[in-house]
């Protein structure tokens, strides 16, 4: 049986709560994000997307589309950084 979007969202919510529970207490500045790299930008983008998903599902108070915008900016930064290093495959 194919899961619904709501079921997928609920699983994502459980995962992000489990993985990022330390991040909630320290505003996301835990060891996972303490390096300057394109990988860090992608991890932060994923966190923003998951936070946006939680807000959209009503599990967290919504503050507009800030997390969605931040996620898109982070991904763009990661792509630009990889492109500068010549590691972006076409």
What feature does the model see in each segment?
Residues 1-90:
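Intrinsically disordered, low-complexity regulatory regions
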């Amino acid at each position: 049986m194919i899961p619904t979007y709501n079921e997928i969202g609920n699983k994502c919510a459980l995962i992000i709560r489990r993985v990022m529970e330390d991040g909630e207490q320290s505003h996301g500045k835990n060891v996972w994000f303490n390096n300057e790299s394109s990988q860090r930008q992608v991890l932060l983008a994923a966190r923003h997307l998951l936070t946006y998903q939680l807000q959209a599902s009503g599990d967290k108070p919504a503050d507009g589309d800030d997390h969605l915008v931040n996620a898109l900016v982070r991904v763009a930064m990661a792509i630009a950084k990889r492109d500068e290093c010549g590691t972006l495959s076409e």
